[in-house]
Amino acid sequence: MVLCFPLLLLLLVLWGPVCLLHAWPKHLTRAHWFEIQHIQPSPLQCNRAMSGINNYTQHCKHQNTFLHDSFQNVAAVCDLLSIICKNRQHNCHQSSKPVNMTDCRLTSGKYPQCRYSAAAQYKFFIVACDPPQKGDPPYKLVPVHLDSIL
């Protein structure tokens, strides 16, 4: 039993950062958190845009992509044919046309002084969609995760 404790402690230490990466503020629905993280109809400078996300999580997010489109248009992608997500779930959907987007990558700093570089892109995207939660827009499915950029 003595040997199990250090191993358990190591697993907890390693699992902690993984949990932070996938957590969202519990007072928000997954769709609202998706909107905060990924929907930006008018491009903003990455340092400014990312501070809004980082203030929720209290750490510098390493990378984030902003889709320059409306939530309504991105939610409409959820009505397209389902495809397999990276996590092997079957609730992903690919956009039918490319959209403008900005990829923000952490270059330096520690929270709250996070600094980012920006790369403008025009690409297709894949989102995971789920039924709406209470408080979400009344769509059949809503985007909850940006699965990939193509």
Swiss-Prot record:
Keywords associated with the record: Antibiotic, Antimicrobial, Disulfide bond, Endonuclease, Glycoprotein, Hydrolase, Lysosome, Nuclease, Secreted, Signal
Annotated site location: Critical for catalytic activity: K61
SUPFAM superfamilies xrefs: RNase A-like (SSF54076)
Enzyme class label: hydrolase
Pfam families: RnaseA
Gene Ontology CC entries for this record: extracellular space; lysosome
Enzyme nomenclature, EC number: 3.1.27.-
Binding site for substrate: K61, H62, Q63, N64, T65, K86, R105
Top-level taxon of the source organism: Eukaryota
Residues modified by glycosylation: N55, N100
Positions of the catalytic residues: H38, H145
GO molecular function: endonuclease activity; nucleic acid binding; RNA nuclease activity
Site (Facilitates cleavage of polynucleotide substrates): H59
Function: Ribonuclease which shows a preference for the pyrimidines uridine and cytosine. Has potent antibacterial activity against a range of Gram-positive and Gram-negative bacteria, including P.aeruginosa, A.baumanii, M.luteus, S.aureus, E.faecalis, E.faecium, S.saprophyticus and E.coli. Causes loss of bacterial membrane integrity, and also promotes agglutination of Gram-negative bacteria. Probably contributes to urinary tract sterility. Bactericidal activity is independent of RNase activity.
Protein known as: Ribonuclease K6
Species, as recorded: Macaca mulatta (Rhesus macaque)
